[in-house]
From Swiss-Prot:
Protein origin, superkingdom: Bacteria
Organism the protein comes from: Streptococcus equi subsp. equi (strain 4047)
Family, as annotated: Belongs to the UPF0223 family.
Protein name listed in UniProt: UPF0223 protein SEQ_1039
Length: 92
């Protein structure tokens, strides 16, 4: 995948909300590119869900992010929930 891609952000979000969403997406990137702490990813996901409340919007963002980056927010959260603690990597 390209190192340069656009994040699926909503222009109606505040700067603080964008920062929270970006933090979560960065945690997902870490899960694929290196290692990420399950607790930290789940914490950032909880903050993300305060902004992206609807399941349909969450799925849309996941689709757009996966199309642009090759990384699935769904798979990262699923793995973090499975292990709960410690570090994991989804790198190929």
């Amino acid at each position: 995948m390209s190192d340069h891609y656009h994040y699926p952000l909503d222009v109606s979000w505040s700067t603080e909300e964008i920062t929270s969403v970006l933090h979560f997406l960065n945690q997902v990137e870490l899960a694929y590119e290196a290692k990420v702490g399950a607790e930290e990813l789940l914490k950032s996901y909880a903050a993300y869900k305060e902004i992206v409340r609807s399941k349909s919007q969450e799925k849309q963002i996941d689709r757009e992010f996966q199309q642009a980056s090759g990384y699935s927010t769904y798979q990262a959260v699923k793995k973090a929930r499975e292990i709960e603690k410690g570090f994991f990597s989804l790198g190929r």
